[in-house]
Amino acid sequence: MEKKKYLTKITPIQEKFIEIYCAKYGEWSATQCAMAAGYARSSAHTRAAELLDWRKHPDIAMEIQERLAGLR
């Protein structure tokens, strides 16, 4: 499987957020996914919102959209 090229480097914690968010989509909130990925409880809500924002992290939002589209 070919590794995707992104506009910016996705960090391991961001990749973990993507995996958890897609696996728990509809069951867990984005904040819960961020905490499970390793973000601090005090900043998880903000980080989750930023990671899902197309303007701040287009690569992450696109990856999530592609993975969720594949689940249907």
Task: Name what the model sees in each region.
Residues 1-72:
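N-terminal, charge-rich alpha-helical recognition modules
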